[in-house]
């Protein structure tokens, strides 16, 4: 069985790198992109993604926008989406979870978050 493949979406290079490296330490293949549009283009052409971890606050489109695009697509709706944000805003957290996100984690993503996140694959 091949390693799980996670798409990491974050407009901040450091945050993309931190999440990617943490996942790779758990034998996860990672593709990292910097925008929702890049994520959607990648998902349109790539069929072996097992989960998406997305920042919430990004220019142009938010992680919630990505979540909505994924959930309305018959091809992608099955994918678990985890939203990561440095903002602990209860209304935003509820909106994402009600919209179908598997989890909403606070940044910086910590090593202790990974087993829970990886359990969604």
From Swiss-Prot:
Q: In which tissues is it expressed?
A: Expressed in flowers and panicles.
Q: Which residues are reported to carry the modification 4-aspartylphosphate? A: 55
Fill in the PTM field for this protein: Two-component system major event consists of a His-to-Asp phosphorelay between a sensor histidine kinase (HK) and a response regulator (RR). In plants, the His-to-Asp phosphorelay involves an additional intermediate named Histidine-containing phosphotransfer protein (HPt). This multistep phosphorelay consists of a His-Asp-His-Asp sequential transfer of a phosphate group between first a His and an Asp of the HK protein, followed by the transfer to a conserved His of the HPt protein and finally the transfer to an Asp in the receiver domain of the RR protein.
Specify the Response regulatory domain's residue ranges: 5-121
Record's Pfam families? Response_reg
Superkingdom: Eukaryota
Gene3D superfamilies in the record: 3.40.50.2300
GO annotation terms (biological process): cytokinin-activated signaling pathway; phosphorelay signal transduction system
Q: Explain the consequences of disrupting this gene.
A: Dwarf, narrow leaf and low tillering phenotypes.
Keywords of the record, alphabetical order, are: Cytokinin signaling pathway, Phosphoprotein, Transcription, Transcription regulation, Two-component regulatory system
What protein family does this chain belong to? Answer: Belongs to the ARR family. Type-A subfamily.
* Job description of the protein: Functions as a response regulator involved in His-to-Asp phosphorelay signal transduction system. Phosphorylation of the Asp residue in the receiver domain activates the ability of the protein to promote the transcription of target genes. Type-A response regulators seem to act as negative regulators of the cytokinin signaling.
Question: What is the name of the protein in this document?
Answer: Two-component response regulator ORR12
Organism the protein comes from: Oryza sativa subsp. japonica (Rice)
- What is the taxonomic lineage of the source species? Eukaryota, Viridiplantae, Streptophyta, Embryophyta, Tracheophyta
């Amino acid at each position: 069985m091949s390693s799980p493949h996670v798409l990491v979406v974050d407009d901040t290079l450091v945050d993309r790198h931190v999440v990617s490296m943490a996942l790779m330490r758990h034998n996860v293949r990672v593709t990292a992109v910097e925008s929702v549009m890049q994520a959607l283009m990648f998902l349109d052409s790539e069929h072996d993604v097992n989960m998406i971890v997305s920042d919430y606050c990004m220019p142009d489109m938010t992680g919630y926008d990505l979540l909505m695009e994924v959930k309305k697509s018959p091809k992608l709706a099955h994918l678990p989406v985890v939203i990561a944000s440095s903002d602990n805003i209860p209304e935003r957290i509820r909106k994402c979870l009600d919209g179908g996100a598997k989890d909403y984690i606070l940044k910086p993503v910590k090593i202790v978050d990974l087993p829970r996140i990886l359990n969604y694959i």
